[in-house]
Every structure is written in C-alpha cells, then in structure tokens.
C-alpha cells in the first residue's frame, strides 16, 4: 500500500516537473536570437555588398564618361596629359581599393573609302597603376556601326574593373562553393565614344 502511494507521489512530482518544464518560457528569446542572428548577419552583409557593387559600377561609368569628356575638349594632346587624365579618372573610385581599374583611351579615324575601316591613330592604357601603350597604331578598332561614318574621328574610352567584394574566397573555397564562388570577382565595364569638340581630330605627338 505504501509502495503504491509513493509511486503515485513520484508520478505526480514528475508530471508537475514536466508541466513546469514545458510551460517555462525563460531563455526563449535567447534561443530565438541564436537561431535568427546568422540569418540577419548574412542579409546585412549581402545588402552591403550589393549596394557597394552598384555604386562602384556607377563610378566605372563615370570614369569612362569623364575621361572621354576631358580628352575631347582638347585640340591636341600629349602622352603626359593623357596619363594625367587617366590618373584623375582612377581617383573617382576612391574609397574602393580592393582591385585596380583598367582605362583605355583610343583615338580612332574611320577611313574615307567604300569599305570604311575604324583605324587606331593612337592609344594609351592605365593598368595595375601604371600607364603605357594601348592598342597598336594602325590596328582595327571596334566601334558601333552607327558611328562608322567615313572620314570621322572618334575618341573611345573604356573603363574596366574586376570588382572584389569585402568578403572574398580562397581558391579552395571557390571550388567548393561552386556557383557561389563566381561572385568572388564581378567584371564591370563601360565604354564611351565621343567626337572632338574643338577640332576635327585630336593628334598626339608623342603617343
């Protein structure tokens, strides 16, 4: 009889403990935060990366536009002036500094014949922080068909950047991430073709 009573008391005690345990809400907020915090942090960093990438892409377009505008305002130009303009263009990307842009300035003349050809007259390039010769003189340049007017002269400026996010991956991580690893570098580029404003063409004596 006593054994049965004691067993019943223990069962009730256990049942009460379980009910209290199930009904206890202490620490729920901490557990929920621990579960949702990684998701919130991921969303924050993704949003930050997307915003920075969009802003940097706009700046690349601004670089090409500004450089083309400055060059086409000249009646003639020299290598030192071209290099200075490209260096000014590079500073537009500040404070982004995780990779360096490539800026190409190419003077193009469309031949005046039955089959017009876009021919490079001179070309300069800024790459890896240094300047040098771009496309070979006399080579064929790629321009839109709408601009292939016989006897015309164009300045083509292209800006390129391999955008690197704040969070980047190692080679081993890229291979394991698969498609996600492709976001380690985002290629951005913009090209502008403008005509000279002050003269028919813009010669460069020492390019």
Q: Where are the predicted features?
A:
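N-terminal signal-anchor/signal peptide hydrophobic helix marking the start
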Residues: 24-39, 49
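Short, conserved structural patches
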Residues: 2-4, 65-207
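N-terminal leader/signal peptides at the extreme start of proteins
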Residues: 1-26
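Short, function-defining helix-loop hinge/capping sites that tune catalysis or transport
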Residues: 40, 57, 168-170
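Alpha-helical hydrophobic/aromatic positions enriched in membrane-embedded helices and signal peptides
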Residues: 16, 24, 41, 150-152
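Aliphatic-rich helix starts adjacent to a transmembrane/signal segment
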Residues: 28, 43-75
């Amino acid at each position: 009889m006593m054994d049965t009573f004691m067993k019943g008391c223990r069962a009730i005690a256990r049942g009460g403990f379980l009910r209290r345990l199930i009904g206890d809400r202490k620490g729920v907020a901490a557990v929920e935060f621990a579960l949702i915090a990684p998701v919130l942090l991921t969303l924050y960093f993704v949003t930050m990366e997307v915003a920075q990438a969009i802003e940097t892409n706009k700046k690349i377009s601004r670089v090409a536009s500004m450089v083309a505008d400055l060059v086409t305002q000249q009646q003639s130009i020299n290598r030192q002036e071209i290099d200075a303009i490209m260096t000014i263009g590079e500073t537009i990307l500040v404070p982004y500094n995780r990779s360096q842009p490539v800026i190409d300035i190419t003077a193009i003349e469309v031949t005046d014949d039955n089959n017009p050809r876009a021919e490079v007259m001179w070309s300069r390039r800024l790459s890896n922080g240094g300047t040098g010769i771009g496309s070979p003189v006399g080579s064929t340049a790629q321009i839109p068909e709408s601009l292939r007017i016989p006897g015309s002269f164009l300045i083509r400026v292209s800006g390129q950047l391999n955008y690197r996010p704040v969070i980047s991956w190692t080679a081993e991580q890229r291979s394991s991430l698969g498609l996600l690893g492709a976001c380690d570098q985002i290629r951005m580029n913009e090209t502008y073709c403008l005509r000279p404003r002050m003269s028919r063409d813009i010669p460069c004596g020492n390019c």
